């Protein structure tokens, strides 16, 4: 624990805790402070002026990161017939219907994204208690309940990131890897922030996007000036 504390203190050196950095400078700092022996994920957190306990203040959506996420995303698809063939052709890792239901019910959940055709949602609905808490339940609002399974699989594999506001009014997501060049990370962050801005609910009052910070998996958080991220 002492070594971990020393590493964290060292990483925070040179950071001004109360300063709001321009996004370009913030990303340079995040990359320079990443010291783990693996390719850390660059993460964004956004504090929103919403209370998600109210239905008209829920924030949820999906963002297609222009430069991908750097993650290997495993995709499961509930589909039959030609749509199942489309899913396999698009690169889905596991495809099925009742057979896939049995696999998931048996506790084997080896996927990061779950897609379903609308006709199979009554079947998938039986898995609500399993998939729901893991954030894997297909939802038409984020494009994972669709007849275009080929497009949905391609999006998931290509860097589509789902987001949903948490109880404290915070959204966080991985937006790339520290190995990405700075400009690609900035482009991803701006695209993600823009998607969250466009998902502003009707019940939101006052300042919607209040605070933004970026960090790496093991690094310190860097506060960001929102105006340098938001395009509108």
From Swiss-Prot:
Q: What does this protein do?
A: Binds directly to 23S rRNA. The L1 stalk is quite mobile in the ribosome, and is involved in E site tRNA release. Protein L1 is also a translational repressor protein, it controls the translation of the L11 operon by binding to its mRNA.
Gene name of the encoded protein: rplA
Q: Which GO cellular component terms, listed alphabetically, does the Swiss-Prot or TrEMBL entry include?
A: cytosolic large ribosomal subunit
Q: Does the keyword Cytoplasm apply?
A: no
Keyword Repressor on entry: yes
Q: Which organism is it from?
A: Methylorubrum extorquens (strain PA1)
Q: Which InterPro entries match?
A: Ribosom_uL1_bac-type, Ribosomal_uL1, Ribosomal_uL1-like, Ribosomal_uL1/biogenesis, Ribosomal_uL1_3-a/b-sand, Ribosomal_uL1_CS
One annotated GO molecular function is: structural constituent of ribosome
Quaternary structure (record): Part of the 50S ribosomal subunit.
- Give the GO terms filed under biological process for this record: regulation of translation; translation
Pfam families documented for this protein: Ribosomal_L1 (PF00687)
| Name of the protein in question | Large ribosomal subunit protein uL1
What UniProt keywords are attached to this protein's entry? Repressor, Ribonucleoprotein, Ribosomal protein, RNA-binding, rRNA-binding, Translation regulation, tRNA-binding
Q: Which family does it belong to?
A: Belongs to the universal ribosomal protein uL1 family.
């Amino acid at each position: 624990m002492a070594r971990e504390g020393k590493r964290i203190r060292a990483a925070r050196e040179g950071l001004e805790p109360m300063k709001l950095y321009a996004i370009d400078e913030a990303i340079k700092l995040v990359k320079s402070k990443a010291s783990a022996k693996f390719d850390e994920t660059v993460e964004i957190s956004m504090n929103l002026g919403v209370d998600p306990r109210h239905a008209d203040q829920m924030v949820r959506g999906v963002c297609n990161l222009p430069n991908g996420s750097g993650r290997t995303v495993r995709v499961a698809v509930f589909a039959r017939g030609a749509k199942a063939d489309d899913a396999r052709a698009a690169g889905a890792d596991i495809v099925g219907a009742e057979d896939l239901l049995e696999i998931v019910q048996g506790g084997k959940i080896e996927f990061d994204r779950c897609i379903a055709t609308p006709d199979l949602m009554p079947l998938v609905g039986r898995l609500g208690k399993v998939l729901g808490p893991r954030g894997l339940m297909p939802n038409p609002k984020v494009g994972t309940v669709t007849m275009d399974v080929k497009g949905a699989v391609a999006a998931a594999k290509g860097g589509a990131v789902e987001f949903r506001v948490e109880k404290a009014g915070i959204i966080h997501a991985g937006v790339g890897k520290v190995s990405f060049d700075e400009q690609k990370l900035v482009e991803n962050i701006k695209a993600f922030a823009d998607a969250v801005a466009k998902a502003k609910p009707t019940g939101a009052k006052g300042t919607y996007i209040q605070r933004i910070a970026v960090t790496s998996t093991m690094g310190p958080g860097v506060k960001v000036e929102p105006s340098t991220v938001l395009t509108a």
